[in-house]
């Protein structure tokens, strides 16, 4: 597991990175995480999130555009534990999560807007690996995202921590 400091990455790569608007909170057991972007666009339906965390995710971060909904949780403890077991670096969720006490103990990075106790409907509706835009930034599959307690940044290519 790599440790990333977004302020240092911003200082080292000012022309490469885009800074996501500061609206996310860190809920995961990892203080920092980063990797190649895999995207999901969905609204109050986490069917695609469930499908993706079942797959191997080494070196990848699942970026979920949940439309900013504050009415349903797109991630809970069971899916977070599956994501960690399958090697995902983390998730950035433009929406809510639940089971926050368990997720805080899970070896997974999780950034989200808030917590909400209600689960989603499972209708199988959503899009996988499409460009998604929220918080002032467009997230494209195959680009890179890095997150820590300071914020979330996006880069078109992988970044190395400065020496």
From Swiss-Prot:
UniProt: substrate binding residues: 76-79, 98
Pfam families for this protein: RraA-like
Family statement drawn from the similarity comment of this UniProt entry: Belongs to the class II aldolase/RraA-like family.
Subunit organization: Homotrimer.
An annotated Gene Ontology molecular function: ribonuclease inhibitor activity
Cofactor binding note from Swiss-Prot or TrEMBL: Divalent metal cation.
GO annotation, biological process: regulation of RNA metabolic process
Protein name: Putative 4-hydroxy-4-methyl-2-oxoglutarate aldolase
Key words, A-Z: Lyase, Metal-binding
InterPro entries: RraA, RraA/RraA-like, RraA/RraA-like_sf
Residue ranges of the TM segments: none
Coiled-coil region list: none
